[in-house]
């Protein structure tokens, strides 16, 4: 998007330390050239990348190398784009960074001439080489459409000039239009309404920066809210434009303010007398402009020019003489300096080569008395493809020049050496074809003579040097990785053809493995795979490495119990935009996070999103995410709040964890270190469940034939549910775990009736430890008595029948006690209900209730929050009690209305709860000074807990609103109800704490008779 800001200097071979990888020596260096004559030029160009290391190229050359060869080497490298057809439009500019002195370098100049003529004028480090588009075709708008790379490069060049020279001078309206056009072009995958989201706009401001699109002066003059609204409105106008349309719209808009296709020089025409004019040179020819109000007058067309000569005058001035066909004398132009005359001469000569029939240079050396420069060795006229082939062959022959600048990242002293000999690797069958070449199965013989099965990645012979660097980038990253769940690098063969040798895993890709074995793979194994990949990602997170392509296609199966993460080709070196352009099959849109699609931002948080999608793939046995959508529709679905549905076999707690990873705000997603802990817990739980199910299936009690008189089964006892773990778990706050039936109390040996606490004393039962929940009293085979005769079987059945009757009697007795306790609670909480009850339960009916007439009433769950009876006190003028009851009523209103209200009205019922909570806390604060100091700590702690409960309720409300139209809507509503219930229970606890303090302070009174 912009060029490199630092000076681009020419450095000697022995002093260069490239920031990223070795230089790309596209220019052929003869073997017999002395080392002192070899140069490395650092040439800057424009790019979309934010990485400064992507915006320049190091070119190795000699003092005899021509400028045209340097330009060609950059164009052939593919660094600025593929398939360049208008190569003659490019030129090389030498700029002095401190004085803005500019010299356009003629293609036939040599590096030695540039050094002797220009670089000696200033310090070497103050010069910079820039690749520029200087010569445009006549109808450049249409011509550039056929060469997309040149079109985008010219756009980047104009954008850079606009931001540096014109942005502060144009009107606010034009600056807003041009900035939004660049926004639309740069973030081409962003939906039209993306900037309407506050989080998206904040991400644009903080992570990308508005300075890249809009002038600072404009941002300072406008208020932030006003500026944001203007951007959103203007962006909507260009939301439907494609990239090329944005570029053309930018050209047309900027052309109304500045001349984008021509250069203007202030000079004098020598025609008997001197006339000061503005000389305009562009695709339409050489024209003069005497005033701003008049139209330019054509002086000459490029087809008419036959010679160009520069002559120095006194006092640093110079004369440019143009020989024009049919004219009696040459056109003489007087300039203020020789450098300006030479720049004009290069511009005119370039247009003559582009538009004229003569492809050589028309510039005549003053020192050679009319000898034209085209008598020098001609510029190679081969097309780019022939030139590409010629240079590739030359570079492969002289491959020893790579050794002159070692890559420090590939050779670290003391580290393992990854170079292997080609004769030690034997290739067998082809496993598949990658982006850069084929992948083979092979055998590697190490230095100990051991034979190791390996996979060998190869690079195509016709691959450009730039693509070879990208191919090698995977090995550069992998050689520094050491983790049991990351693919291991065996070695690298850097000589042509380049090979990367890695461990071979016989089970292949995880996606194919899941499809083949989906009938035999169990849930614990699938969770184990996810846990292992999560550990690998936590390792990458610790070394600040972003993978950017986490999917089952890039995971290999080492054994049925071990998987390994691979394919690090995109981890750091390949630019974001290149990955979008690779091919349809490699587009990762359906795995990407919203900020990666919208803004091309790849961070650890975006890797967390992709990892959750990968978990979804694993639990779906290799299905592609969003297979029912096209790539272009995915971001719209994500923006609406929709997420991937829960796979059929996915545990609910694991799916809840996935949804946390798919939070729209990257900062709210968990880190990989946290995910490892959560997945470890889930894996442990799923494994214990599987073990219990397998044990129950293996050891079943013997079937005993019962007599015909006892065919009717006894009533099924009630089943206490699994107690929730502490809410400090990361998986999902206040998540209602769904425990399989095998772990519930339906098995008689899980929790004996004697051990089951009644609702009255359950409050004093110590909490169950998380792992103790799964410790069942499993029945072993020797626990069963095998009857030896029919009579003995009948006796066993009678004993079992008596035991079952005792259990039922005990449970029915507990139900009577529960019913009495429940009525006492109702009387205390709402006296009106008890007064309106016209049919109280009589003792006679209670006695008759022991006869089983229907299914027993289930006692409260073990995990439920039981509420103790309210103290029997005089509630006259008790504001705390009154406010607690009002708050509970507000919570009940929320519970009853939530399913009927539209999402935008959730805030009304939640606000009602908040107002009542404020009244409650206010009444407690008024009473607090009269209570003992020893009781205040507990009361104040409960008040803080209530405030936290309200904040949690608000968060759940917002979550429910965001997911109102998604498949997560009902789950979010349940979480909202859970949060409101917790708030009501804590309010009751606050009332109990206040009552206890009032009793201690003798402020409580019994109720009046």
Swiss-Prot record:
Taxonomic path: Eukaryota, Metazoa, Chordata, Craniata, Vertebrata
UniProt region (Interaction with TGFB1I1), positions on chain: 801-1009
Reactions catalysed: L-tyrosyl-[protein] + ATP = O-phospho-L-tyrosyl-[protein] + ADP + H(+)
Name of the encoding gene: Ptk2b
Sequence similarity: Belongs to the protein kinase superfamily. Tyr protein kinase family. FAK subfamily.
Top-level taxon in the UniProt lineage: Eukaryota
Record-level Gene Ontology MF annotations: 3-phosphoinositide-dependent protein kinase binding; ATP binding; calcium/calmodulin-dependent protein kinase activity; enzyme binding; glutamate receptor binding; ionotropic glutamate receptor binding; neurotransmitter receptor regulator activity; non-membrane spanning protein tyrosine kinase activity
Originating species: Rattus norvegicus
Protein's name in the database: Protein-tyrosine kinase 2-beta
Phosphoserine sites (modified residues): 361, 375, 399, 762, 839, 866
């Amino acid at each position: 998007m912009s060029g490199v800001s630092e000076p681009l200097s020419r450095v000697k071979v022995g002093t260069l330390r490239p920031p990223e990888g070795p230089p790309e020596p596209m220019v052929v260096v003869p073997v017999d050239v002395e080392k002192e004559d070899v140069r490395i030029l650092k040439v800057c160009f424009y790019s979309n990348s934010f990485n400064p290391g992507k915006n320049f190229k190091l070119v190795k050359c000699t003092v005899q190398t021509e400028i045209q060869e340097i330009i060609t080497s950059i164009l052939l490298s593919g660094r600025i784009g593929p398939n360049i057809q208008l190569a003659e439009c490019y030129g090389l500019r030498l700029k002095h960074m401190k004085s803005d002195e500019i010299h356009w370098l003629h293609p036939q100049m040599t590096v030695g001439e540039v050094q002797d003529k220009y670089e000696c004028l200033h310090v070497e480090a103050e010069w910079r080489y820039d690749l520029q588009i200087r010569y445009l075709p006549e109808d450049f708008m249409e011509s550039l459409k056929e060469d997309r790379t040149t079109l985008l490069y010219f756009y980047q060049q104009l954008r850079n000039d606009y931001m540096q020279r014109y942005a502060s001078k144009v009107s606010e309206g034009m600056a807003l239009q041009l900035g939004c056009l660049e926004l639309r072009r740069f973030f081409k995958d962003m939906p039209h309404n993306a900037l309407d989201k506050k989080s998206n706009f904040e991400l644009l401001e903080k992570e990308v920066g508005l300075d890249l699109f809009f002038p600072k002066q404009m941002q300072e003059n406008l208020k932030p809210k006003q500026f944001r609204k203007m951007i959103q409105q203007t962006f909507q106008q260009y939301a439907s434009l494609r990239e090329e349309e944005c570029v053309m719209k930018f050209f047309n808009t900027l052309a109304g303010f500045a001349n984008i296709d021509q250069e203007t020089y202030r000079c004098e025409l020598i025609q008997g007398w001197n006339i000061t004019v503005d000389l305009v040179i562009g695709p339409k020819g050489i024209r003069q402009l005497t005033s701003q109000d008049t139209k330019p007058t054509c002086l000459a067309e490029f087809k008419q020019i036959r010679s160009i000569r520069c002559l120095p005058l006194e006092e640093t001035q110079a004369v440019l003489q143009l020989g024009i066909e049919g004219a009696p004398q040459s056109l003489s132009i007087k300039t203020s300096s020789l450098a300006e005359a030479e720049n004009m001469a290069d511009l005119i000569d370039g247009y003559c080569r582009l538009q004229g029939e003569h492809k050589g240079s028309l510039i005549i050396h003053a020192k050679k008395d009319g000898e034209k420069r085209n008598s020098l060795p001609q510029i190679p006229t081969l097309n780019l493809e022939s030139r590409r082939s010629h240079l590739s062959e030359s570079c492969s022959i002289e491959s020893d020049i790579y050794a002159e600048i070692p890559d420090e990242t590939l050779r670290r002293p003391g580290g393992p050496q990854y170079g292997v000999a080609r004769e030690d690797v034997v290739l067998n069958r082809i496993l598949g074809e990658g982006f850069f070449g084929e992948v083979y199965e092979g055998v590697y013989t190490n230095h100990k003579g051991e034979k190791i099965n390996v996979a060998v990645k190869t690079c195509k012979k016709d691959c450009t040097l730039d693509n070879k660097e990208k191919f090698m980038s995977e090995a550069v990253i992998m050689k520094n990785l050491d983790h049991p769940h990351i693919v291991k690098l065996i070695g690298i063969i850097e000589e042509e053809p380049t090979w990367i040798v890695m461990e071979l895993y016989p089970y292949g890709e995880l996606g194919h493995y899941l499809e083949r074995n989906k009938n035999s793979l169990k849930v614990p194994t699938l969770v184990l795979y996810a846990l292992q990949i999560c550990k690998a990602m936590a390792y990458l997170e610790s070394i600040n490495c972003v993978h950017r392509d986490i999917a089952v296609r890039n995971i290999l199966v080492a054994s049925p119990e071990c998987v390994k993460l691979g394919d690090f080709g995109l981890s750091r070196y390949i630019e974001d935009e290149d990955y979008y352009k690779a091919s349809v099959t490699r587009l990762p849109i359906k795995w990407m996070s919203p900020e990666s699609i919208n803004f091309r931002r790849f961070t650890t948080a975006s890797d967390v999103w992709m990892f959750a999608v990968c978990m979804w793939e694993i639990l779906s046995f290799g299905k592609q995410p969003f297979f029912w959508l096209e790539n272009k529709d995915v971001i719209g679905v994500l923006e609406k709040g929709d997420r991937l549905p829960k796979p059929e076999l996915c545990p609910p707690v694991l799916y809840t964890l996935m949804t946390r990873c798919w939070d729209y705000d990257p900062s709210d997603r968990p880190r990989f270190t946290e995910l490892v802990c959560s997945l470890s817990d889930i894996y442990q739980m799923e494994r214990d469940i599987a073990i219990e199910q397998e044990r129950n299936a293996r050891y079943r009690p013997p079937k005993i034939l019962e007599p015909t008189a006892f065919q009717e089964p006894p009533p099924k006892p009630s089943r206490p549910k699994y107690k929730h773990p502490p809410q400090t778990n990361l998986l999902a706050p206040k998540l209602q775990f769904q425990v399989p039936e095998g772990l519930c109390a339906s098995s008689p040996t899980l929790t004996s009736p004697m051990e089951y606490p009644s609702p009255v004393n359950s409050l004093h039962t110590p909490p169950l430890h998380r792992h103790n929940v799964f410790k069942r009293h499993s029945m072993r085979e020797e626990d069963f008595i095998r009857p030896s005769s029919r009579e003995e079987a009948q006796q066993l059945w009678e004993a079992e029948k008596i035991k079952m009757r005792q259990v039922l009697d005990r449970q029915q007795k507990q139900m009577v006690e529960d019913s009495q306790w429940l009525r006492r609670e109702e009387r205390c909480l709402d006296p009106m209900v008890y007064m309106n009850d016209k049919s109280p339960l009589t003792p006679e009916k209670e006695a008759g209730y022991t006869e089983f007439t229907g299914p027993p009433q289930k006692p409260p769950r073990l995990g439920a929050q039981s509420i103790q009876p309210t103290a029997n006190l005089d509630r006259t003028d008790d504001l705390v009690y009154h406010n607690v009851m009002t708050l509970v009523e507000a919570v009940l209103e929320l519970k009853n209305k939530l399913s009927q209200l539209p999402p935008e009205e959730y805030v009304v019922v939640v606000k009602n709860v908040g107002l009542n909570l404020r009244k409650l806390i206010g009444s407690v604060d008024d009473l607090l000074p009269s209570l003992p100091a020893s009781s205040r700590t507990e009361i104040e702690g409960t008040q803080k807990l209530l405030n936290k409960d309200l904040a949690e309720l608000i968060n759940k409300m917002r979550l429910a609103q965001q997911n109102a139209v998604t498949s997560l809507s009902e789950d979010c509503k349940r979480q909202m109800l859970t949060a409101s219930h917790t708030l009501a229970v804590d309010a009751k606890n606050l009332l109990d704490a206040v009552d206890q303090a009032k009793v201690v302070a003798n402020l409580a009174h019994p109720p009046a008779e």
